[in-house]
């Protein structure tokens, strides 16, 4: 990898994917939603210019008021909304939806092709954050560990310190 390469955040990646889907279908909105039964756990939204965000409103809707595209797949390309589903686990379903489509007759193959990668990116980011957390915290207690202390010492300005202390406790067999 070059020195100029900087990994992009999950938000940037998902926004790029949703923006591409929105442009392809010329829709007002594109959503990626993870729902457990009828409760929305995760929601990402991308909308056309000068179109108000609806993410928070959608998240608060009771299940009986949720739009049709959120409850069932809509693959009829003459409809004004398309949605595809993917079962992530026993209770969780991923939904990718283009809402307010202006260019009808498009194949939904793009949505079917893209959908599996979004939850994968989300899962990878969660695992990365967990690894980062565990590199500076004890897994059993959640307390800061030696790596955290060493990192702190690398970044602290000695001239600004008035005092510094560290407590280290090693109890044999605690983790066994």
Per-region residue spans from a language model:
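Conserved nucleotide-binding and Mg2+-coordinating catalytic segments in signaling enzymes
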Residues: 129-151, 169-176
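GAF sensory domains
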Residues: 28-97, 101-106
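Generic recognition of well-ordered alpha-helical segments
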Residues: 19, 113-116, 151
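Helix-loop-beta substructure at the N-terminus of cytosolic sensory domains
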Residues: 3-47
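A conserved signal-transducing helical linker
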Residues: 1-15, 125-138
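Nucleotide second-messenger and two-component phosphorelay signaling modules
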Residues: 135, 154-165, 169
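Amphipathic alpha-helical "output/dimerization" segments
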Residues: 103-123
């Amino acid at each position: 990898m070059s020195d100029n390469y900087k990994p992009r955040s999950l938000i940037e990646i998902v926004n790029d994917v949703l923006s591409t889907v929105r442009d392809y279908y010329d829709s007002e909105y594109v959503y990626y939603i993870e729902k457990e039964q009828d409760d929305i756990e995760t929601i990402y939204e991308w909308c056309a210019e000068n179109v108000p965000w609806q993410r928070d409103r959608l998240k608060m809707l009771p299940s009986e008021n949720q739009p049709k595209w959120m409850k069932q797949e809509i693959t009829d390309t003459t409809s004004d909304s398309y949605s595809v589903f993917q079962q992530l686990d026993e209770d969780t379903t991923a939904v990718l939806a283009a809402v307010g489509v202006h260019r009808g007759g498009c194949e939904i193959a793009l949505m079917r092709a893209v959908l599996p990668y979004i939850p994968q990116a989300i899962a990878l980011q969660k695992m990365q954050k967990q690894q980062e957390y565990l590199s500076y915290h004890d897994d059993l207690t959640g307390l800061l560990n030696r790596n955290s202390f060493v990192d702190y010492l690398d970044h602290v300005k000695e001239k600004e310190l008035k005092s510094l202390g560290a407590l280290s406790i090693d109890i044999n067999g605690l983790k066994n």
